[in-house]
Amino acid sequence: MNKYISIACMALAITCITFTAGYAHEGTELSSKDLASQIGKTESELKEIDKKIIAYNEKVIANQADADAHFNLGVLYEQKMKFNDAISEYQKTIQLKPDSIEARINLSLVYTERNMYEESVGTLKQVLEIDPDNVDAHKYIGRSYYKTGLLNEALEEFKRALELEKKDPEIHCYLESVYFSMGRLDDAVAELKKAIEIDPQFKTAHLNLGFVYYEQGKLDEAMEEYELAIGIDPKFADAYSNMGLVYCEKKMFDDAIKILKKAIEINPTLPDAHSNLGFAYWNKALKNEDEELKKKAMREVTIYKGLVGAQ
């Protein structure tokens, strides 16, 4: 979940990861290097995925009824963000194996990537017809309801999922998202603390807790959570990006610029980091009456817009 706050004509963006990362999809012209960065793979790993795609395509050509091959193709296409192809392969899997829960779950997640929430919910309800107590189905139905603004319905699904699986920290993060959207920040904090109690190494929970603290004006507490997230994953670009905003809020623009450059070094295609760096440059420029810094700020905003347009 991304939050954007306009200040002095600059976009201030702070990240609260809730469900899935904001990936690009078909139609996006990305270099292999940029694609690798987007999906967290190396270029050599992408080449291995391509080899597997070729191999499984050969399998389905030889045997169109090979449900497992179609399923594996769906997984590989999903990894490459070829979502239309992934949808097609998962649908073929379901035709061949009508009781396949895993194919339906994966299909629903791809629908969500394409903002096809109605289709996602419909597919997940098919899962519940097969297995009424499927935790993932309740979680992901809740996620689609949340994404479409059906907060009470989302809350009901997440609570049902939690009844079925009390030790799933992710569900607490989902509940936090709903409570945050309802303005129930104390409840949001409570859910994130429960997630961290279950899994102290859950970096997303620390990131989101930092986000809620930031919204509450508790800057020191927010910084502490971001530092914990980075301690868990030193390459967690979102945490560096959010940390930069805390520095901006404290008027520590040099520190903000330094940490935001670190975020971009880790993930050059993270939109929020570019937006936030532009925000830091802009505010430092206003403070120092520096036209060159304003140019740097606008360049970062241009990069940000290009990246958002590519998603």
Describe the predicted segments one by one:
Residues 20-72, 76-81:
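N-terminal leader/linker segments that initiate helical-solenoid repeat arrays
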Residues 44-58, 80-92, 102, 113-126, ...:
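Structural signature of tandem alpha-helical TPR/SEL1-like repeats
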